[in-house]
């Protein structure tokens, strides 16, 4: 078989390979880059949009003033040498520790929770529905503001509730037996105070007791417990605090009433051999000299 001829040895030159044509640009993926002026304009537009969004986040319709956030502030951690030792009764309490303490106000001069629970159970035992017991107690206390909360009180009438009525004698006897009528009235003094102001209804006998018009709301036994923190408080708080004029008028009448009721307390014995069948000598106080210099 004869050999094939070598193309390089022939006189004809070999044909050169044609270069591949560049790919065609299709769509935006292969778009030509924009000029430097167009890039700067787009960047400025993006900055403008971001600036508008930033300014929108700062819009508000209120401006705080006189700022003070004491409640809820982050607690400070004392240094080791200043930490209080709970085992040492002489270690000092910081203001933060005192602020976090929760100690309820108490008073031995008013009915406590145990006594009120006994009173509530006894009144319910009379047949008063449990949902009306609190209202019955409050009505009795308001009535006592006009008559008296004395242990010698002999009431007349009834206390009505939506489904019936109960004699005042029964309710007051229960209160006297369980806690003392005046102690129960002291517990509700702030509520009674608000009731009288809302209804514009001062104690009935304020004029007979010698009170002036501006001090007429102070003419009840438990006035001096209106601002007591251990008493039952109205939801909104006191409508107003007692005025100095009301306080002075109440204390003056209270002093005279105590002296009048304590005439016999000066006697060592109440037998007729000591008293002669008469009340004790009247206690006389000269209040006019109280302001003499």
Swiss-Prot record:
Molecular function terms from GO: structural molecule activity
Region feature Disordered, mapped onto this chain: 1-39
Leftover remarks: The N- and the C-terminus of this capsid protein may be exposed on the surface of the virus particle. The central core sequence may be important in maintaining correct tertiary structure of the capsid protein and/or play a role in interacting with the viral RNA.
Similarity remark: Belongs to the potexviruses coat protein family.
Task of the protein: Required for genome encapsidation. Forms ribonucleoprotein complexes along with TGB1 helicase and viral RNA.
Organism for this UniProt entry: Potato virus S (strain Peruvian)
This protein's GO CC annotations: helical viral capsid; ribonucleoprotein complex
UniProt keywords, alphabetically: Capsid protein, Helical capsid protein, Ribonucleoprotein, Virion
Keyword Ribonucleoprotein included in the entry's annotation: yes
Pfam short name (any one): Flexi_CP
Record flagged with keyword Cell membrane: no
Top-level taxonomic group: Viruses
Compartments, record wording: Virion
The name this protein goes by in its record: Capsid protein
